[in-house]
């Protein structure tokens, strides 16, 4: 994309035209300790990087957005972060942080026996019932999502890591 429109996935299409975009992978040389994964977050103790995959839409009225974390260490706790700005990518623990600005922390979840977590549907309704307007998922707002998780045996020995990120341009 040219001009002032963001293009986080570098595909030449302005992100606001796509609604939902994945970004913040961990290509070389960005991994904090060489734990690079160009297709996901930085490598964790499973041997691969964790993914945060969107499904559904960016429509607040439909409220059908689902964000699924996968390739996560088994039976570990984590939280989804949403921020109104993109930062970095910044080295953070064994991974990269890309969700920043005004940050909201969603309810903690365990990765369970499958190494997965799911948030949604109903994210817009939850945000409206829980947070002040500045942190709500409203039409016309842009939010960046990542899942932060504990990973004590992780490759860099920092004890935690993050998935790649998803940016959502919320519409009516």
Q: Where in the sequence are the language-model features?
A:
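Amphipathic alpha-helical interaction elements
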Residues: 5-6, 147
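Glycine-aliphatic tripeptides that mark coil-to-beta-strand junctions in extracellular
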Residues: 1, 8-16
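A residue-level detector for conformationally permissive "hinge/kink" positions
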Residues: 3-4, 132
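Residue-level hotspots within well-ordered secondary structure
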Residues: 18-172
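Extracellular, cysteine-rich, disulfide-stabilized repeat modules with beta-strand cores
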Residues: 6-8, 26-27
């Amino acid at each position: 994309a040219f001009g002032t429109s963001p293009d986080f996935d570098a595909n030449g299409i302005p992100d606001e035209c796509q609604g939902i975009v994945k970004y913040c992978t961990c290509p070389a040389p960005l991994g904090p300790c060489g734990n690079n994964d160009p297709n996901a977050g930085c490598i964790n103790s499973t041997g691969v990087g964790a993914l945060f995959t969107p499904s559904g839409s960016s429509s607040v009225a439909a409220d059908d957005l689902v964000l699924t974390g996968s390739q996560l260490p088994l039976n570990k706790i984590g939280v989804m972060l949403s921020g109104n700005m993109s930062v970095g990518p910044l080295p953070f623990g064994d991974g990269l942080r890309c969700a920043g600005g005004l940050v909201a922390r969603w309810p903690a979840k365990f990765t369970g026996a499958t190494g997965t977590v799911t948030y949604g549907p109903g994210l817009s309704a939850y945000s409206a019932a829980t947070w002040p307007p500045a942190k709500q998922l409203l039409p016309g707002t842009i939010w960046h999502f990542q899942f932060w998780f504990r990973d004590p045996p992780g490759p860099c020995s920092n004890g935690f890591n993050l998935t790649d990120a998803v940016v959502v341009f919320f519409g009516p």
